[in-house]
Amino acid sequence: MTALIGRDLLSLADLSPTELQELLALATQLKSQQLNLRCHKVLGLLFSKASTRTRVSFTVAMYQLGGQVIDLNPNVTQVSRGEPVQDTARVLDRYLDILAIRTFAQQELETFANYAKIPVINALTDLEHPCQILADLLTVQESFGTLAGLTLTYVGDGNNVANSLLLGCALAGMNVRVAFPVGYEPDAGIVAQAKAIANNQTEVLLTNDPELATKDAQVLYTDVWASMGQEAEADNRLPIFQPYQISEQLLSLADPKAIVLHCLPAHRGEEITEEVIEGSQSRVWDQAENRLHAQKALLASILGADSE
């Protein structure tokens, strides 16, 4: 994966289809312990949003690669007192080998990347969540043996996960459908990018009809109805999103061998029922584990880890 050495990952659109497949192949090798890589570098985590899976998986991945991790809580850095992002970026560039940022605005992430010479990884913004989708695609590939030609349906809020799924599925040669209530559509710019990548070779469908979107799909995916920072809207969103719940009834419209994904945390009884998330078609826990393997592959590729 020499092509990714020293590069940022701010969006899945930063990858080519070949680079995506190579990342997933490396993740599979690392997961099966067929390859022992070491990089001995220092990763900084600058997270302005709460995190369980992203924080822990990045930390464990870096330790397993022989590196070190510094957790940079913005609340105890000068960022919280108004230090300009560009100044912080240029200072961290002198201390760290790579930086993963979890923040609200995509623009803040891009400013860090513009001013820091070290690689910057998008660990979640309001616009995209590329590392999550790497794990999602790895999980789908493990379940079906391939990605090309499969149909993934996302049901719910057109949020950062939906945006990155549009890009990731298009890059992987998958059909992607997003079902959402009126007014909660994915980002228009991301949709245009996904359609350009798909180039009419695969389906990119946006609809307000969850049943239409689910029909014969091999993967059914959902996320919370109110993302971080939208907690005040949660109660008002409940009746709007109720028809977009992944239930056994909706799942019955999908391919009989369909799998169910959720990036977690889940609000059982809202976007997904208890029966579905705990059912035989759920791959949610494999999906969560694969955050570790996908991000380890990403770190190893960007840092140019050596085999031992």
Model-found features: residue ranges?
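Positively charged, low-complexity intrinsically disordered leader regions
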Residues: 1-56, 60
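C-terminal helix-to-coil terminal segments
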Residues: 278-308
